[in-house]
Amino acid sequence: MEESLRRFLLRRGPGTARPPDRESRGAVASLAAGGISLPINRPQNGATVNDLLIKLCGMREQALLDCAADLGVNLCGFIFAPESPRAVTPERAAALDSRGMLRVGVFTTDDMRFIEATAATARLDRVQLHGDQSVTCAERLSRTLGAERLIRVLWPRRYPDRHALEADMERHAHAAGMFLLDAGTSGGGSGQRVDGEGLRGLHAPRPWLLAGGLTPENVREAVEACAPHGVDFNSGLESEPGRKDPSRIRAALTALRGKSS
């Protein structure tokens, strides 16, 4: 991944970000223009994956945030969906120190006031729309929060083929800075796996993360199959629902990097 684009993707939210430098502004322009001409070298056939963005979702404990930060995780996810065993309150998330990782809030609701208020309370750098939020909802959030701060989740299994998925990504691209492709047909954290081979050669208008049942045992193969810009771990690194296992976090990063973390 070109370093200027990587810096842009890891910019913080309002109040914590510096003004983008010239190279970062160029990356922003490339993103806004859409298409697949992003200057990104993604891993293929065993090439290095050290520049992948790594997100760890479902964080609730300071000790695990410390572990993730020490291992080089880029983004930490806080789930604001009451039905999830990994849910936290905005106040609890605000009390947790992300140790330099970008703070991502995961929402299944389309209650825009709640999303906006939580983004402020929990000091979120990114907002992940992980439900059936309408385009109108995303457009409003893009105006109030900034489109580059939105991560739009799509489920490849909903589409008859890759081209239909690409068309829907284009439809949402104006109100998203990044996509996340998850397993199943809704929700997340189920442990179901995305078919990486089915995403090989995907033409995406924005950088995208691969999610869905990623574990230390399968993440390297999944990345090499479809070359995402990053990965999102959740249930695959747990000893039980809602409880992350530090040894599995280390094992997953070791599997990705091909060396001890």
Show which residues each predicted segment covers.
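N-terminal beta1-alpha1 ligand-phosphate binding loop
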Residues: 55-64
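Extreme N-terminal basic, low-complexity initiation segments
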Residues: 1-11
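A short, Lys/Arg-enriched amphipathic alpha-helix followed by its capping loop at the start of a domain
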Residues: 67-73
